């Protein structure tokens, strides 16, 4: 007990520092707007990503980390194993996992397939116009400089509107080298190397990447090579029979007096310097 008491002042300081950081960020949002603050945060994260090695980018590893989830899409063409990134894309990950456990995706078709681009599913209507999130409303894109539309990426499909993520998702299938398209956009070296194996860089920051295929890309390619009609819908009915949650993730709920409410997502990270 004495040892615990010894660290109480330090814990209090860290909590106050964290709340101070959150308070200042909220003030900045109120004065300058969300876009300004979000861009500033993203720029700071990008600077860190540009200096990082391969291990900083979870898509580049086939291993499922302790802070990651794992699912298997059992399709009519075979299994696709995907790991999810709840700490980097909390909303998209929670949405997908809850839908999977509720069997929302069971029996849905791959309604849109574009060869050498991507395969898309998650729409109960089967035509690209349906589906909703677990919150019954759309949610915003979660951009991060640590996740990209490289080959095998799992991402949320949206309409282009500000908060239009629902239930639809796509898997990037393109195999062609995309590294030359990156130019001087500031991509981290490990990601440039990954794009040499294919991907869709035009989708970066526009769509939320929240997972990566770690097994079953041959199945993705099989679906990607299907014959389609003029609306990019496969002429052969290919379905997601079920989505098995192999490794779940517990999303923590944090209550603070500052906000007077609930903040749901990933556990708070006290910044090194507030």
Outline where the language-model segments fall.
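Cyclophilin-like peptidyl-prolyl cis-trans isomerases
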Residues: 1-274
